[in-house]
Swiss-Prot record:
Keywords: Ribonucleoprotein, Ribosomal protein, RNA-binding, rRNA-binding. It comes from the Bacteria. Part of the 50S ribosomal subunit. It comes from Citrifermentans bemidjiense (strain ATCC BAA-1014 / DSM 16622 / JCM 12645 / Bem). This is Large ribosomal subunit protein uL6. One of its GO terms (molecular function) is rRNA binding. HAMAP family: Ribosomal_uL6_B. This protein binds to the 23S rRNA, and is important in its secondary structure. It is located near the subunit interface in the base of the L7/L12 stalk, and near the tRNA binding site of the peptidyltransferase center. The keyword Plastid does not apply. GO terms for biological process: cytoplasmic translation. The keyword Ribosomal protein applies. Belongs to the universal ribosomal protein uL6 family.
Length: 179
């Protein structure tokens, strides 16, 4: 039995879960999410909780059991609280600003980097060097943060670049000159 898969998912107040096989829809105060559920698992929706069970003990069913439960839980959390990822920009002259649906980044290139934000994602900029990527879909929030970081990943010598707020960069010693 999957230790994660057998846990029930509590439904907070204001969140509605609708399951019409194979699609599950979750609606809440922050928005709506829908996802297709794979084969091998059964979903039982009550007023207070959602439980995920598997039909049999095949490898496919066992692997889908915990995954399905976690995906549904992320949907419920997303429409009730939302998700956010914090990014930091380090470097002289490196900065960010948001204009409408476009994130403008100055990252030391000869040109500014303009990144169009996906639908449902908002970015707040604090002090031009701290970014907060927010949204209701955990996958899209993480993917957007990873794409922003990929424009200029942190380098190991001075630490310049875009990094996650909780990320530690292994620093290297520079060259030592001959004497």
């Amino acid at each position: 039995m999957s230790r994660i898969g057998k846990l029930p998912i509590a439904i907070p107040a204001g969140v509605k879960v609708i399951y019409n096989a194979p699609e599950i829809k979750v609606e809440g105060p922050k928005g709506k999410l829908a996802r297709n559920i794979g084969e091998g698992v059964a979903i039982d929706v009550t007023a207070q909780a959602v439980t995920v069970t598997r039909h049999d003990d095949t490898i496919k069913s066992r692997s889908a059991h915990g995954l399905t439960r976690t995906l549904i839980n992320n949907m419920v959390i997303g429409v009730s609280k939302g998700f956010e990822t914090l990014l930091e920009i380090n470097g002289v002259g490196y900065r960010a600003e948001v204009k409408g649906n476009v994130l403008n980044l100055a990252l030391g290139f000869s040109h500014p980097v303009n990144f169009e934000l996906p639908t449902g994602i908002t970015v707040e900029v604090e002090k031009m060097t701290k970014l907060k990527v927010m949204g209701i879909d955990k996958e899209v929030v993480g993917e957007t943060a990873a794409k922003i970081r990929a424009f200029r990943p942190p380098e190991p010598y001075k630490g310049k670049g875009v990094k996650y707020a909780d990320e530690t960069i292994l620093r290297k010693a520079g060259k030592t000159g001959k004497k």
